[in-house]
Amino acid sequence: MQEIIASVDHIKFDLEIAVEQQLGAQPLPFPGMDKSGAAVCEFFLKAACGKGGMCPFRHISGEKTVVCKHWLRGLCKKGDQCEFLHEYDMTKMPECYFYSKFGECSNKECPFLHIDPESKIKDCPWYDRGFCKHGPLCRHRHTRRVICVNYLVGFCPEGPSCKFMHPRFELPMGTTEQPPLPQQTQPPTKRTPQVIGVMQSQNSSAGSRGPRPLEQVTCYKCGEKGHYANRCTKGHLAFLSGQ
């Protein structure tokens, strides 16, 4: 009715201008105060707020998808710098630990999300391709679908909204499993008497090796021969004095 009599879209009251320009808004007495009940700062959204941490309005940056669990208890000290959402939104609550760990939660009024474990299971790329060697023991989900005949022929007019399956014959990167290569078995080589004699002589020479005589041992502490370093009585700096 008021639009028929006279349009007031071009009229702006002083109160609306004061709210938009934040006239009369006093800065906070100290930074880090709880501003969860305050409005969003319009100047910060335009990168034009000069009050910084003393601004009485909320500074929201980026897309925050999870509610801050410390803010729910009134214990979050980060304020606007918190990377989580300071807003009670049931769709953005963190996942319930007890339901995800044990499959049940005794709290009838649990504020956290109860996500069905089956919804977390990913589809098996091998089964979607046509065959999975793990069968029912596969840790991924095997979903039975009816293949679209038009897509197999070459073109489906329904596109992504088709109720039948459009198979994808390529596998995602990082999920391909290559079967182990068969080990190349070599026939055992026959040892001739000459080879056996050489091996026996090598084993006997290796077994006959013992500690070297003291005349060939040089002490690295004093530089003299005739004893090991752990038996040296002249100290570890004896080679500097030339003793």
Swiss-Prot record:
SUPFAM superfamilies in the record: CCCH zinc finger (SSF90229), Retrovirus zinc finger-like domains (SSF57756)
Zinc finger (C3H1-type) stretch: 35-61, 62-89, 90-117, 118-142, 143-169
InterPro entries per UniProt: CPSF4/Yth1 (IPR045348), Znf-CCCH_3 (IPR041686), Znf_CCCH (IPR000571), Znf_CCCH_sf (IPR036855), Znf_CCHC (IPR001878), Znf_CCHC_sf (IPR036875)
Classification via Gene3D superfamilies: Zinc finger, CCCH-type (4.10.1000.10), Zinc finger, CCHC-type (4.10.60.10)
Domain of life: Eukaryota
Segments of skewed composition (Low complexity): 175-193
Stretches for region Disordered: 174-193
Keywords of the record: Metal-binding, mRNA processing, Nucleus, Phosphoprotein, Repeat, RNA-binding, Zinc, Zinc-finger
Zinc finger (CCHC-type): 217-234
Modified residues (Phosphoserine): S241
Function: Component of the cleavage and polyadenylation specificity factor (CPSF) complex that play a key role in pre-mRNA 3'-end formation, recognizing the AAUAAA signal sequence and interacting with poly(A) polymerase and other factors to bring about cleavage and poly(A) addition. CPSF4 binds RNA polymers with a preference for poly(U).
Family: Belongs to the CPSF4/YTH1 family.
Subunit note: Component of the cleavage and polyadenylation specificity factor (CPSF) complex, composed of CPSF1, CPSF2, CPSF3, CPSF4 and FIP1L1. Interacts with FIP1L1.
Name of the protein in its database record: Cleavage and polyadenylation specificity factor subunit 4
